[in-house]
From Swiss-Prot:
Domain of life: Eukaryota
Keywords carried by this UniProt record: Electron transport, Heme, Iron, Membrane, Metal-binding, Mitochondrion, Mitochondrion inner membrane, Respiratory chain, Transmembrane, Transmembrane helix, Transport, Ubiquinone
Family to which this protein belongs: Belongs to the cytochrome b family.
Disulphide bridges: none
Cofactors (names): heme b
Protein name: Cytochrome b
Amino acid sequence: MTNIRKNHPLIKIMNSSFIDLPAPSNISSWWNFGSLLGACLALQIITGLFLAMHYTADTTTAFSSVTHICRDVNYGWVIRYLHANGASMFFLCLFIHVGRGLYYGSFVLSETWNIGIILLFTVMATAFMGYVLPWGQMSFWGATVITNLLSAIPYIGTNLVEWIWGGFSVDKATLTRFFAFHFILPFIITALVMVHLLFLHETGSNNPLGIPSNPDKIPFHPYYTIKDLLGLILLILPLMTLVFFSPDLLGDPDNYTPANPLSTPPHIKPEWYFLFAYAILRSIPNKLGGVLALIFSILILAIIPLLQTAKQQSMMFRPLSQCLFWILVADLFTLTWIGGQPVEHPFITIGQAASILYFSLILIAMPTVSLMENKMLKW
């Protein structure tokens, strides 16, 4: 068995990635989220495949086909709610995974980090297009509002929006192409994940201390396979609780009304995992400025390695930086809350303050505090 594992051309790749992989001996539970993201991706592809067997990408039948899945298909409601709530779990793991990278300085592994940012953008695009497919009120108006943002691009904006729509409004052509993209993107994500892992295994994993772990490595299996399995069980528990007890908790009631282009919902908002970016978009009165802030709110992650001024890679022994990190987390919670509120006083002001704080923390406060900590440690 060992000979096959180590000599077979295909199995030896698996062996060097998941069995005999040398891993740091001190990586904590925050490192579990990579494998949990892999599990979420597998769940989304499998449930999505079964949903695609029954779904019809047509404006007249899309809404009723989703109803048909929930009512007439064997365990269709379980598949549908696993897919919808699985997306929420996916993003929860994704945000924690990125947060861990920030906290422990994993962004110094620049290739892995940059592929991760591309993955984040791709997953967000996939989730947005998936939200349009049930063709409820929020699906239709969400698609209209978000795609319309591209019209802010000078000169080519309007033409670009109509090209994406496939007409002069969100209609059948838009739904069909969104379904096609929503189907293909998870496979592109899987390919990107492989590249992500390839670069990670080139350098080896980071660890909580942020120091080289070459002198102290342990095999990935059985130690971290068991640890990842425990993480998976702890992820399945809340997911199943959501699916079986409160499947619509994270959804919008407006999406149970079929799409009607003649009736605008009182408050258009995306799913919870986009609310922080949506709040940043809304906090700027100018359309182009809002779109740029929205894109930069994610793209800012790409310049974090350039803003690293600390002599220590990890924040583990940098209490001031830790304090700023948790202020950033609280700020993101505030932005998420604001994104779900109507555009009125005092929410507008809170949103603007939270948006300014978000960019100030990353661009100014964190690099400055890191320099202060270097001085305190006489480095």
